[in-house]
Curated annotation (Swiss-Prot):
It comes from Drosophila pseudoobscura pseudoobscura. GO terms for molecular function: sugar transmembrane transporter activity. The lineage of its organism: Eukaryota, Metazoa, Ecdysozoa, Arthropoda, Hexapoda. It is found in: Golgi apparatus membrane; Cell membrane. This is Sugar transporter SWEET1. Gene3D superfamilies: 1.20.1280.290. InterPro entries: SWEET (IPR047664), SWEET_rpt (IPR004316).
Amino acid sequence: MSAVAYELLSTTAVISTVFQFLSGAMICRKYIQKKSTGDSSGVPFICGFLSCSFWLRYGVLTEEQSIVLVNIIGSTLFLIYTLIYYVFTVNKRAFVRQFAFVLAVLIAVVVVYTNRLADQRDEMIRITGIFCCIVTVCFFAAPLATLLHVIRAKNSESLPLPLIATSFLVSLQWLIYGILISDSFIQIPNFLGCLLSMLQLSLFVVYPPRSYSGQGYKLVEQAVPF
């Protein structure tokens, strides 16, 4: 692949991912309008912040500027979403505990553990990459309960088709990017992201929506951080 095509792929992947991250802004806008988070969970925001923070660390270690850029933006956005959720949730104490746990994990792994391997750069990259994959794969598990509901109901109207299609394209872009730079830690989670998106898209064929609403997912839960 030519340098121009490579730059085009990395640039479009970053732009697509940022637009995907911005889906959380629509959720937060509703919180602000209603002055309440209702019964929605703040966990996706916290997980998004954790995932982007890990990938930011990984990008810095591997000196991949595209990874660094997209995750600086992602971690900033998810931190803002987290703060907005905190302002409007009634269960602040539980939410603070969840966020404190995530910060503890982030500090323990990124700051303490990996810095002990400062003289073993390859091992530090490997360990950070493993944590990135684990967090991202766990984030992929968020929509699975809805998929089971769709299968039981034999109706895909609760799935947001445009967002799923976008997720597939974003995962595919990063998968190709990971293949080009021979990075299995980028390839693996995005390969799984492609599979999950294709599974969801196939449900529209197997179980056609009786009346499409596309509101079954909270948008941010589908915006898998990378």
